[in-house]
Amino acid sequence: MAEKMKLEIVTPYSKVLDELVDEVTATGKMGEFGVLPGHAPFLTSLNIGELCYKKDGQAVSMALNWGYFEVQDDKIIVLVETAERSDEIDLERAKAALGRAEDALKKLTPEDKQFKVYEAALERALIRMQVAGKAARK
């Protein structure tokens, strides 16, 4: 069994990460899951959430927006709309986005077309704040 696995994170705009890592955890449609070297191949969809990987004993957290996560041999490919490392997130901007989403949701009902859009914006802002908080604690 390999000791490390290759992790690639790709957005429509760039390859965000290409590293050898020890383990990965992420948030899928069915909840949080983890992958270690030698894991069986699989493909799953990702929710808005956190991806954490460990490299040489150091944990790195990232905020992800919807996408796909595939394991094949000792390689993980993550295709997502956006991916931000905890130290790249502007906490004030995330708080402002949270406020805008909360304000919009107060004016809407679940039947409104824009309700799901602002609900997702709220979820993204909360995840970004959670992940950014991890960088602040380091």
From Swiss-Prot:
InterPro entries assigned: ATP_synth_F1_dsu/esu, ATP_synth_F1_dsu/esu_N, ATP_synth_F1_esu_C, ATPsynth_dsu/esu_N
Gene Ontology MF terms: ATP binding; proton-transporting ATP synthase activity, rotational mechanism
Gene Ontology CC terms: plasma membrane; proton-transporting ATP synthase complex
Highest taxon above the source species: Bacteria
Keyword Transmembrane helix on entry: no
Record text on subunit structure and interactions: F-type ATPases have 2 components, CF(1) - the catalytic core - and CF(0) - the membrane proton channel. CF(1) has five subunits: alpha(3), beta(3), gamma(1), delta(1), epsilon(1). CF(0) has three main subunits: a, b and c.
Name listed for the protein in its UniProt record: ATP synthase epsilon chain
Chain's role: Produces ATP from ADP in the presence of a proton gradient across the membrane.
Protein localization: Cell inner membrane
Residues annotated as transmembrane: none
PANTHER family: ATP SYNTHASE DELTA/EPSILON CHAIN, ATP SYNTHASE EPSILON CHAIN, CHLOROPLASTIC
Protein family: Belongs to the ATPase epsilon chain family.
Assigned keywords, A-Z: ATP synthesis, Cell inner membrane, Cell membrane, CF(1), Hydrogen ion transport, Ion transport, Membrane, Transport
Gene3D superfamilies (UniProt xref): ATP synthase delta/epsilon subunit, C-terminal domain, F0F1 ATP synthase delta/epsilon subunit, N-terminal
Topological category with respect to the lipid bilayer: Peripheral membrane protein
Keyword Cell membrane appears in the UniProt entry: yes
